[in-house]
Amino acid sequence: MAAPRQIPSHIVRLKPSCSTDSSFTRTPVPTVSLASRELPVSSWQVTEPSSKNLWEQICKEYEAEQPPFPEGYKVKQEPVITVAPVEEMLFHGFSAEHYFPVSHFTMISRTPCPQDKSETINPKTCSPKEYLETFIFPVLLPGMASLLHQAKKEKCFERKRTKFIACDFLTEWLYNQNPKRAGEPFTEFFSIPFVEERLKQHPRPPIPLSLLLTEEEAALYIQSFWRACVVRCDPEIQELRQWQKKLREAKHIHQQVKIFWAKQEQKVKCKMEDDAVPAAKMKIPSS
């Protein structure tokens, strides 16, 4: 059997006597300094209080054990992307100040690039990214900016339905901003040749009148309809309308109107025939 563990002498403290006179006379207690305690303390005996809970500690330890990248993954060093000003992206003939009304752009430092980049890139052999950045975006971005300004004017961001069609506006803008048509007058969307041919083969349904009217015109229509409705609800007006209806039925007004228009059509037909007879009698000069 193992021997019982002995307690060091410097840990033992003297207890005061339990006599009745202890309240008046106390036995002095020897004080022991902290520096004299040189007991070896193991790591499992003392644990520091942590602010994190157990779950956070487990997650932190698991993340520390995991590698930063999966096996077989290679970090690709991508080149530094420089931002070019919008003015250099536009073709000749486009005004960046007109479509981007900003006094100046805050640009980062960049390496100088050749001015005629579009001339050195072959559109048939270049990559899709180079083709978009060189031939598509310089033309399309100003059109998209104008499209957003026009959509704001048409209140597309405020209403659920409008007469504004974004594709039609962009087609019209690109057609009129074509450098090959420099100096030619403005052409409306429905007057563009390929648009006319397309609409002949695939006609569009008519746009509702509520979308074509302006706010002032729509207000006049609504006010006139409401006033007429209020007037017709008057009892005296209703009585007058009933009397007029009975009068039309008694005198056969509808039948008389049909006879009148039939006579008018007959007169017009006879007049057209009389005008056609002298034209047929005219001799055509021989060549």
Curated annotation (Swiss-Prot):
CDD domains for the chain: DD_IQCK (cd22969)
Protein name: IQ domain-containing protein K
Domain of life: Eukaryota
Origin species: Homo sapiens (Human)
